Amino acid sequence: MMNHRERVMAAIRGEPVDRVPVSFWLHNHAQENTAQALAAETVRLHHTFGWDFLKPQSRALCFAEMWGQQLEYSGQRTVAPAISRFALRDARELGSLQPADARTGALAEQLQALRAIRAAVGADVPIVANQLASQLRRRSIRSERFTNRVDRPSRAGSVG
């Protein structure tokens, strides 16, 4: 019988596997707001379901938090956090964003969670971490007023 990594890597290479590699990821808004909770929930789900690879689901807007976005969490697993303060109020502020420091804040928490997950599951379980497209990040850090001015093309097709 193959271990998780052998199964996933064989499938990627198009080689025979003992069974199809399986995984699943989801937002659990009540368990993804700290590195410890995200790691514990990811490891719990892995042990419960025997997933072959993991894609830890970072909290919904954690990357926007790196630039000052403030959120209010419901504590419920199916209710996304509400934005209490946008990182950007309008398009003029876009140029003021600075590169995020991976050693602090939300990004550091995500890296801490990945390290804790790796320590808990060992090297035989592949972990896939992703960063969504920068366009999606921009959409999550600005107010509706910013959306109206930048994201919606005018009838002539130009960006207003």
Give each language-model segment a name.
Residues E72-G160:
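Active-site-proximal, glycine-rich beta->alpha crossover segments in alpha/beta enzymes
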Residues M1-V79, Q112:
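N-terminal basic, low-complexity leaders that serve as flexible interaction/assembly modules and, when applicable
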